């Protein structure tokens, strides 16, 4: 009996389809229909009979939910199991869906902080810093870097998952993902901390004293001068930490934005901010 094999072309097709995984998002099965759509090239390759194709499609219409950028290993391992099943291996529906469930949780645990908590804020911050100066490269930089990394994660995850098959489950159970997540979180916090002083500008021009200088000119000491001597960027850091604390207490971000607008306008009108 000729062995049925998923080709590299099938993997490319599944990779391209995976970018539409959320197009059919719903609150019953989340990405379930999208995952089924991703599997169609493999199913057509492995099951020539229409009845077998229908059964395989139904098998993948169940609930599925993980970070889209890291869904590659799940698609690949599932395809590898379908390939083994099509070639006579004793693999039932429960085993295939069990592997999907076993992978999507750990991958979401690392994918969310990596993609949404680290990659997107860092690339958006870099793009915004250019956009604030009127540079059109700002949004383009964000778009291309974010998507290049996102697509690379998905593609190499797909290749790795298909190459290793179900053995990848043991890797997901180790400390590798936890260490990767912690490292990415530290990097993201470091970059955002550096950008705090660049983005947040607070100036308190209240005059504390005026003294004659050596050249006869008047030397004015303001509250901002004193704060800068103690710790440059102290107010920016304090405001950022306050906002983080309020967000952690579930304060509505929109209200915080309006509050900052109001504080800035009132402070400038009364002369204690500029």
Swiss-Prot record:
The chain crosses the membrane at residues 61-81, 99-119, 126-146, 186-206, 226-246, 253-273. GO terms for biological process: phosphoenolpyruvate-dependent sugar phosphotransferase system. It comes from the Bacteria. InterPro entries: GatZ_KbaZ_carbometab, PTS_IID_man. One of its GO terms (cellular component) is plasma membrane. It is a multi-pass membrane protein. Its main location: membrane. The EIID domain, with its homologous EIIC domain, forms the PTS system translocation channel and contains part of its specific substrate-binding site. This is PTS system sorbose-specific EIID component.
